[in-house]
Amino acid sequence: MPSLKDLKNRIASVKATQKITKAMKMVAAAKLRRAQEAAEAARPYSQRMAAVLSNIAQAVGADDSAPRLMTGTGKDDTHLLVVCTAERGLCGGFNSQIARHARDHVRKLLAQGKTVKIICVGKKGFDILRREFASLIIDRVDLREVKKIGFENADRIGHKVIELFDNGEFDVCTLFYSEFKSVISQIPTAQQLIPASAGEAVAEGASAIYEYEPDAAAILSDLIPRNISVQIFRALLENVAGEMGAKMSAMDNATRNAGEMINKLTLNYNRQRQAQITKELIEIISGAEAL
């Protein structure tokens, strides 16, 4: 049984931890608001760009003028996975959910005899995936020193992916991230970047007829690389919002658990103190009677 001094020290230690978790919750809540606004602002642009890309791709079709980023290599042998997670922890299962989603996909591809390569964006995903797939990781993007995610960060990743594709390093590229829904809901998501899927053309009204200058294929050649960077940018923003939401929820739970632990330790402390006082009183009374 711990002594009164030990219990007192433990109570003080838990109270200090509770102050830290409460402060971290408040910081995460403040950052969440800004991150959520940024993620929600990026969604319409990325969705609209994907829609425009789809319409132009439908016009081009699969003829010889279509860019390779849209048509692909014609093979499905080598897959590149871009896995986006957070640089830091203390956000519940946020990072492990994304990494688990990517890991299951890797296992599935390997079981089919495919070659897999991984680019890790964020330290936590790298730490998780390298335990099983260290030999498959070809690059790691470090964003620890980036205070605010900007388009230039996503653009560098996008250029790296396109460079690898142009060099014949892979056939299919899939982006993994967590789509932010709410503070308590972040959904691990996989999105194919290359080949850029034409999808279904989005109707622009009854007379949606366009002429493309210089031509649709040339526009696609410029648009697809930008779309890749835009989709990565959106994924990074969604991740930041999801990370802050998960961190706020985790720190709220930690603060509440610390409060419950303090109550239990305080109750135990008071019981032991009461028992010690009672014992001392009995000893005093017994000594007085002996006299």
From Swiss-Prot:
Its main location: membrane. It is found in: Cell inner membrane. Gene3D superfamilies: 3.40.1380.10, ATP synthase, gamma subunit, helix hairpin domain (1.10.287.80). It comes from the Bacteria. One of its GO terms (molecular function) is ATP binding. Disulfide bonds: none annotated. GO terms for biological process: proton motive force-driven plasma membrane ATP synthesis. GO terms for cellular component: plasma membrane; proton-transporting ATP synthase complex. Keywords: ATP synthesis, Cell inner membrane, Cell membrane, CF(1), Hydrogen ion transport, Ion transport, Membrane, Transport. It is a peripheral membrane protein. PROSITE patterns: ATPASE_GAMMA. Belongs to the ATPase gamma chain family. F-type ATPases have 2 components, CF(1) - the catalytic core - and CF(0) - the membrane proton channel. CF(1) has five subunits: alpha(3), beta(3), gamma(1), delta(1), epsilon(1). CF(0) has three main subunits: a, b and c. Produces ATP from ADP in the presence of a proton gradient across the membrane. The gamma chain is believed to be important in regulating ATPase activity and the flow of protons through the CF(0) complex. This is ATP synthase gamma chain. It comes from Sinorhizobium medicae (strain WSM419). The lineage of its organism: Bacteria, Pseudomonadati, Pseudomonadota, Alphaproteobacteria, Hyphomicrobiales.
